[in-house]
């Protein structure tokens, strides 16, 4: 499918009742964050919070499809949509081509003043193919691995399913794969900065605060 930047539209996230103005300033760092984690790890928690709490938030659409969620109060662009639907982030986009198109929108001059947050279960489980795709100067690529324990991930997925049976082995396999990626990252990609995105033991507000202050843990 052929995509064109001419077909883009903007729409406010908060049409009727807006959240209060965001207190404080959160300058961009010139970075693109590639967040990796299994189901239930909390990958979408921070971007969902930003979209819900930024009164200036808006989405960029193409043919009715949400490509970007822009949070000006936090100087962050989140790839994909962050609403009440089940699929969030790049998982809400159709395929790799659409993900790359969304990234190309974020590369446009009007958006370069923002940092970018890219997360989804499919890119999380791939070891290397997204590293070159997300190396997009002038932004610096930073890979972030969720620090959420396996037991917590499994518990969250079970809760989402209302306690119904699910294939726990799929969550375990994805968690182990992402954990393996974190252990191998420095050896495979020594020039690509990486860290741990803090979630374990934190409230949602604490996790968001840690991210906004770029307080990342070490992968060592």
Curated annotation (Swiss-Prot):
Name by which UniProt lists this protein: 5-hmdU DNA kinase 1
Pfam families: HMUDK_HMUD1 (PF18748)
Matches recorded under InterPro entries: HMUDK/HMUD1 (IPR040924), P-loop_NTPase (IPR027417)
Domain of life: Viruses
Keywords: Host-virus interaction, Inhibition of host innate immune response by virus, Restriction-modification system evasion by virus, Viral immunoevasion
Disulphide bridges: none
One of the GO BP terms on file: symbiont-mediated evasion of host restriction-modification system
Catalytic activity as recorded in UniProt: 5-hydroxymethyl-dUMP in DNA + ATP = 5-phosphomethyl-dUMP in DNA + ADP + H(+)
Family designation: Belongs to the thymidylate kinase family. 5-hmdU DNA kinase subfamily.
Protein function: Phosphorylates 5-hydroxymethyluracil (5hmdU) into 5-phosphomethyl-2'-deoxyuridine (5- PmdU) on DNA as a step in the pathway leading to thymidine hypermodifications in the viral genome. The phosphate is added internally to the DNA polymer. As a final result of the pathway of hypermodification, 5-aminoethoxy-2'-deoxymethyluridine (5-NeOmdU) substitutes for about 40% of the thymidines in the viral DNA. These modifications probably prevent degradation of viral genome by the host restriction-modification antiviral defense system.
Alphabetized SUPFAM superfamilies for the sequence: P-loop containing nucleoside triphosphate hydrolases
Phylogenetic classification of the source organism: Viruses, Duplodnaviria, Heunggongvirae, Uroviricota, Caudoviricetes
